[in-house]
């Protein structure tokens, strides 16, 4: 798949990031990971991002990364495109991106480089080096220490034909509008704030109708229903799901740092698709929080 074909796919529909399955010892569990992908693929997501943030990319070893991407690509071939997460130091991000390309992924999501602050010039150099190390499409994730402005993205768009997308996990409306207006149709734009459904209607109004859903991992039907409601401007359905599910869900998620991933694994466990524990430094939900989440999920009905 060439970068422009991938860009077209990512320009509409719902996206998601499968959890990474671990056993009780914290080791990658390939068989249930494959079954997870087989379960999720038919629900209609435009693309799935393997070993992304929700997939605990930041906790994976290189050998595990290769196995995860291979399982994802092999399992979903002909069903749904797989993009791989990559990130960290520039040379590591390059190595992972090249490995993902070798294994047949359709593209990569470039996560932040972590820890150190960087100038716009440094961020441009980092992203440019990753883009030029591969032929397939690259989506850059604006989040944490990687906050590219419109000037920097314009430079990258000119220098890197395979930079096809910009995912926003910052939520700076002025910056997002500036980037969207400046870059126009050169990139595809993805909403990427945690629990993106809460912000979906606002991002759609800015010209960013596509977003990634974490809750797709355990309530895929509801996630797709919500996306369609936003797309069709069914404000009644959007408001009801936000009030009945997403705001109470946020109340649980916001109780502890790192729960953005933990609560998704908890949800998967509750619906019978257990992905195992999160890896340290993340922590799993407490028993009473599991009960509260279970009650929210049951109100939604069958998935």
Curated annotation (Swiss-Prot):
Which terms under GO biological process does the entry name?
A: D-glucarate catabolic process
Supply the InterPro entries for this chain.
Answer: Aldolase_TIM (IPR013785), DapA-like (IPR002220), Dehydro-deoxyglucarate_dehyd (IPR017655)
What keywords appear on the UniProt entry?
Lyase
Q: Name one GO molecular function term.
A: 4-hydroxy-tetrahydrodipicolinate synthase activity
Which EC main class describes this enzyme?
A: lyase
Q: Which reaction equations make up its catalytic activity? A: 5-dehydro-4-deoxy-D-glucarate + H(+) = 2,5-dioxopentanoate + CO2 + H2O
Coiled-coil residues? none
- State if Lyase is listed as a keyword: yes
Q: Which residues cross the membrane?
A: none
Q: In which pathway does it act?
A: Carbohydrate acid metabolism; D-glucarate degradation; 2,5-dioxopentanoate from D-glucarate: step 2/2
One Pfam annotation, family name?
Answer: DHDPS
Q: What is its EC number?
A: 4.2.1.41
Q: Does the keyword Lyase apply?
A: yes
- Tell me its family: Belongs to the DapA family.
Q: Under which name does UniProt file this protein? A: 5-dehydro-4-deoxyglucarate dehydratase
**Phylogenetic classification of the source organism:** Bacteria, Pseudomonadati, Pseudomonadota, Gammaproteobacteria, Pseudomonadales
